[in-house]
């Protein structure tokens, strides 16, 4: 079965580095778990007035509030079919500050939107379109687009003025034999909100059951 990222990228998926093709190329039918472990060279957040915004998101694992250097990091990717039968991939990120902080997401591919839809947090309140391209070096570039807030079956587009725009680049360093990741999240009013960069290695194992804690508490059908 084709992965959601193969559907999103189409023929350009073949331009990715082979290690990225492996990491983003499995589906629920493959029964594979991918767990990345590494270190973020730097995790940062914006000016002090952004912290209440970050703290609000952190309550539902949508954002993180910690900062520092050489922060241990894990990312857990499991492919499964959700309660609506949609091919879904988890992105469960843990940053090990003095205490663990989580930034979690589940992703699907929406043919209607011609994009990956990234459901952020524990209750899928926030749905974000992700637009992906492969760069000339075989890296994966991701930029967030339209955002929608959903609660009690009602979906509302988030005004661009208050949206957080994420830019992500993931690549593979053949010299280090590791993945590189850099994420920057900004707001057009408040400026940079937070970001991180670092490296990690990925291990692949047979998946018998998706851990309950990486699945959202609540699923939403609205893409």
What kind of region is each of these model predictions?
Residues 215-222:
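HotDog/MaoC-like acyl-thioester-processing domains
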Residues 186, 222-223:
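Amphipathic alpha-helical hairpins
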Residues 186-192:
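Exposed beta-sheet edge/beta-hairpin loop segments within beta-rich domains
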Residues 2-185, 196, 208, 212-215:
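Soluble ligand-binding/transfer domains with enclosed cavities or grooves
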């Amino acid at each position: 079965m084709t992965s959601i990222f193969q559907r999103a990228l189409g023929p350009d998926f073949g331009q990715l580095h082979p290690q990225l093709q492996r990491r983003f190329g499995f589906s629920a039918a493959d029964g594979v778990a991918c767990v990345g472990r590494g270190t973020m060279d730097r995790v940062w957040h914006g000016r002090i007035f952004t912290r209440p915004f970050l703290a609000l998101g952190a309550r539902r694992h949508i954002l993180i509030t910690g900062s520092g250097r050489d922060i241990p990091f894990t990312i857990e990717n499991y492919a499964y079919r959700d309660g609506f039968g949609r091919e879904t991939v988890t992105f469960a990120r843990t940053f090990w500050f003095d205490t663990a902080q989580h930034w979690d997401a589940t992703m699907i591919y929406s043919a209607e939107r011609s994009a990956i839809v990234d459901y952020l947090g524990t209750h899928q309140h926030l749905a974000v379109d992700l637009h992906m391209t492969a760069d000339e070096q075989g890296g994966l570039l991701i930029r967030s687009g339209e955002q929608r807030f959903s609660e009690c079956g009602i979906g509302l587009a988030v005004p661009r003025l208050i949206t957080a725009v994420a830019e992500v680049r993931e690549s593979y360093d053949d010299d280090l034999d590791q993945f590189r990741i850099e994420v920057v999240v900004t707001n057009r009013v408040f400026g940079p909100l937070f970001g991180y960069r670092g490296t990690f290695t990925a291990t692949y194992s047979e998946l018998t059951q998706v851990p309950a804690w990486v699945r959202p508490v609540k699923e939403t059908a609205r893409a």
